Amino acid sequence: MTVRVRGIYATALTRLLREAGHEVVQASGPIEDRFDGEFADERAAVTVTTTDDQQGVGVIGDHDAAAAVTDRLTELGRDTLHWSDPTPEGAIYAGTVTDTLGSGAVVDLGDGEGFLPYSSSDERVETGDTLRVQVVEASAPWTDGRPVLDTTVAVRGSLLSLVRGETASTPGTGGPAMLDLIAAEPRDGWGVSWESASEDASFDALAAALDAANDRAAAIDASLDGADAPEDCAPTRYDEGRSTVWLWFGRESRFALDEVRREVTSTMPGHHRVKAGDRAASAAVDYVEALCDDPETGETDFPFAVTTRQFGPQVGGSLSLGHGKPDGRLITLGNGEVQSVDDDGTVTIEREMSPGGTYDALGVPKEAGDIAETKVKEGRWWYPTVYRDSDGEKKGTYVNVCTPVEIFPDTARYVDLHVDVVKHADGAVERVDDDELDAAVERGHISEPLAERARSVAAAVKSALE
């Protein structure tokens, strides 16, 4: 039996379900990293998804398979409670509109109420209307939400969906050509729509998924063919849909899940208890566990790799240079796009320069199309910026000597120590602004020990560039 698992309980539930002999499929990236062996990208008979409030999970799928998963999960602890949904996902109803709200209508289904967004109906919806609807998103019983409805009848899956009344493959990930590559056809009167996950699935897996969807479509056809029109029978259920069960995890159950997860990866006490409480706290849990999981990083004073993976900066984002001055001012040297983030603490950013004037100490003009590439490294007393023109030709390098760089999620901060080193396009190297450093010492802005450190760094950088 195949199961797809998502949410904050995924690691523990993947372990539990695999031990119970079930095959976990369509695993997320972190799950693939934590477990040995490959996970197939094929149709899931059951999907286990964490609820939006993270208090439990929904188990949705084929009836026998969902029952087996539910039975295993209810064994977690005595405070795991479960309820079958009276308006299960995929169920089809003749319903009566009882109220119209700002964005949709409330529909009496007989088994309960549902919410039909106006965008999910091709026709105008008014109070008193009767119409055929399908549950597309079920709602846990402990929430205030109603199940979400749609007037389009479909067999919805993570690899593909079949839409009743369509006659062709819907353009998308696979498009019509996909049907030429697999050994299956959609049921007559139904069109297939390929989901993004189908890109990673094998042709055999797609064919099997389409066969299963066809079986479900046949059951729907049998329920609807010859059935009374909604105006003659509402409210009533035409088709029972997929098994939908909600499980609430209590405190004991969450701690039991901690123990299971701990068999797979570093897990702090109360992992699931904390994560269930707040999304911000969830991020803190991930951070702490990442520190514990990889202590041998070679980082002696600061866990840079873990911190940036959790909070940034990240490739494609932006990072500014918070250029402090010894007199207490702070100048922001623009934002650059992050090109790379290395575990050793190095972040590379690029900035496009505005034309006009010349580059400090280099004496070359700033021109349209110029690019500045800056490499900052956590804890280093200097950083280089290489200037290139629009053709990629180097115009010069400016090395700023500063207090040790600190790289925060959105800015790299330091205090400029005045003395700098430049390397011209012709290879000439010079040290500049020693007089400004001396003046800052005289004014009391920089201590003599700090100034001596700056001079030592500048000398070492100059020697390395020559």
Swiss-Prot record:
SUPFAM superfamilies: FomD-like, Nucleic acid-binding proteins. InterPro entries: DUF402, FomD-like_sf, NA-bd_OB-fold, Ntdp-like, RNA-bd_FAU-1, S1_domain. It comes from the Archaea. Residues 90-152 form the S1 motif domain. PROSITE patterns: S1. Pfam families: DUF402, S1. Keywords: Endonuclease, Hydrolase, Nuclease, RNA-binding, rRNA processing. GO terms for biological process: rRNA processing. Its EC number is 3.1.26.-. GO terms for molecular function: mRNA 3'-UTR AU-rich region binding; RNA endonuclease activity, producing 5'-phosphomonoesters. Probable RNase involved in rRNA stability through maturation and/or degradation of precursor rRNAs. Binds to RNA in loop regions with AU-rich sequences. Belongs to the FAU-1 family. This is Probable ribonuclease FAU-1. It comes from Haloarcula marismortui (strain ATCC 43049 / DSM 3752 / JCM 8966 / VKM B-1809). The lineage of its organism: Archaea, Methanobacteriati, Methanobacteriota, Stenosarchaea group, Halobacteria. The gene is fau-1.
